Amino acid sequence: MTPGSRSACRWALLLLAVLWPQQRAAGSGIFQLRLQEFANERGMLANGRPCEPGCRTFFRICLKHYQATFSEGPCTFGNVSTPVLGTNSFVIRDKNSGSGRNPLQLPFNFTWPGTFSLNIQAWHTPGDDLRPETSPGNSLISQIIIQGSLAVGKNWKSDEQNNTLTRLRYSYRVVCSDNYYGDSCSRLCKKRDDHFGHYECQPDGSLSCLPGWTGKYCDQPICLSGCHEQNGYCSKPDECNCRPGWQGPLCNECIPHNGCRHGTCTIPWQCACDEGWGGLFCDQDLNYCTHHSPCKNGSTCSNSGPRGYTCTCLPGYTGEHCELELSKCASNPCRNGGSCKDHENSYHCLCPPGYYGQHCEHSTLTCADSPCFNGGSCRERNQGASYACECPPNFTGSNCEKKVDRCTSNPCANGGQCLNRGPSRTCRCRPGFTGTHCELHISDCARSPCAHGGTCHDLENGPVCTCPAGFSGRRCEVRITNDACASGPCFNGATCYTGLSPNNFVCNCPYGFVGSRCEFPVGLPPSFPWVAVSLGVGLVVLLVLLVMVAVAVRQLRLRRPDDDSREAMNNLSDFQKDNLIPAAQLKNTNQKKELEVDCGLDKSNCGKLQNHTLDYNLAPGFLGRGSTPGKYPHSDKSLGEKVPLRLHSEKPACRISAICSPRDSMYQSVCLISEERNECVIATEV
């Protein structure tokens, strides 16, 4: 058996097993009769005779469909006999097995109708106790007939029947066979606990699912409480198995993309980055300052791209991370040439002669002493007790003795070098940084370090190049010589590139050349198919000539009868031409007539008059132009008068003479025939 047929059989069995518990069966049940006591005090038979030595009694039971009047016939619902149960009067005990079983069982295999007829007969046998019904000489003691209705149920219905000789006490009921339920024992249900279903049967035959199962046929397990309906499933109760892409005890957590570092997902295989992270796998730190706090001593950290940052140091600190503490005297706090002495937590200024104060800021000189240097202007104050110098640009100090150094505030970030340019300053940045203060990080790939079309990747330790086929080296600067391009397979100055394998190459052709090796020029147009075009044109011309010849032949054939008629007309005498009948006085009758015409010796002057559909009644009385009265004796007859003509079949006594003309313009081709009885003249269109 093929795998397909085995699968089909498996599904067929599954369908049969699922539908089997609910099918409507024919029914199956048992009519039970319990005999309790029989009394025959006198030991008499039904015929009035006594039993000798006593009535050895057995019973015959016949169960059949309901009959208003019980009649003899087959026991349609079943029958049963008992062994000898006693003599004359006796009590019948219940017995569940062996001979003499009580209650008596009458099984049936149909839907219980609810009504019945029951015949109970008591018999006396002189023969065998175990099979008395087969013994000869059995005699009837008594019989009772019960007709009525009985519903299926476990309760017994008791009754007692008495007559003049006997008394019988009994009870009966109808119960369904195993696996059959309902009011008529027609509902089949078999409890089961397997992969086809997990249920028990209710008293009415309906299914009652076992704990943990649900569905019409109790074949669907109840999953763990809270298990996601779409993302989880179960094959047995209290279980939660996750579908691909989901995880967690309740299958409500999606699985992110493999390699996702700092991201989450809302659908499987997604990587949505957390705040401060970027990249395909959320592994690029966009908020390095927050995650790592690289700046020390209270300095301010500023993010400048993936893994990039800048530390702005507080006064007294320096370094890339502001990790270096400056000397207290580094800011030159002492003025007017005072010397600074650095202590652990402070400093001290040693003032030169003529100055005093914490920073030597006070002078004992006056403007008269010309204390201002480098062109500074002195201004008296405090009533001559002190002075102030107004310094020119690029100089500072209480006496304008210091040249302004614009780099003292360390304005250049990321280790940049500050250059003092007089009234301004510039920052010389380290490689990888730019900006006025070297605050911007430059991608290592911005300089396009990869040669020959290599792809640059900006990594933490520097750029990395992915080289195209045919090149290698850190910057893709080395051409691989052991490849298909080494032999120079490309022509006409084309550039050769190694393919994906060493034996493959691709030629990049210059303008004007094509082909796998650029060996074909494209300047010349392809040759025109003159032979094919010429042959096609010749066939068309030949066909046109044949058509023209056929048309000409047809025209010649059509014109030949007209030429013959014109020739005959030209041969007529003037008298014959003048006596032609105009076409306006002829009428076509659409009747076929056959005339016998005598055309004399000149047969060309008369056309055939046979089979022409003409009205021969308009010619009489016509007098042609130039004709003489009396030449035609009957010419004075009315045009409307109809004179019958003799047809060929009438065998006229005369022969008809006709004059024919094919004139095209004023006259039609006609034959003029005399209307006289003997001459039979008539005009007809030819």
From Swiss-Prot:
Residues 219-252, 256-283, 285-323, 325-361, 363-401, 403-439, 441-477, 481-519 form the EGF-like domain. It comes from the Eukaryota. One of its GO terms (cellular component) is plasma membrane. Residues 552-686 are cytoplasmic. Keywords: Cell membrane, Developmental protein, Disulfide bond, EGF-like domain, Glycoprotein, Membrane, Repeat, Signal, Transmembrane, Transmembrane helix. It is a single-pass type I membrane protein. SUPFAM superfamilies: EGF/Laminin, Growth factor receptor domain. Residues 28-530 are extracellular. The keyword Disulfide bond applies. Disulfide bonds join C51-C55, C62-C75, C176-C185, C189-C201, C209-C218, C223-C234, C227-C240, C242-C251, C254-C265, C260-C271, C273-C282, C289-C301, C295-C311, C313-C322, C329-C340, C334-C349, C351-C360, C367-C378, C372-C389, C391-C400, C407-C418, C412-C427, C429-C438, C445-C456, C450-C465, C467-C476, C485-C496, C490-C507, C509-C518. Glycans are attached at N79, N109, N162. The chain crosses the membrane at residues 531-551. The keyword Glycoprotein applies. Interacts with NOTCH4. Interacts (via N-terminal DSL and MNNL domains) with NOTCH1 (via EGF-like domains). This is Delta-like protein 4.
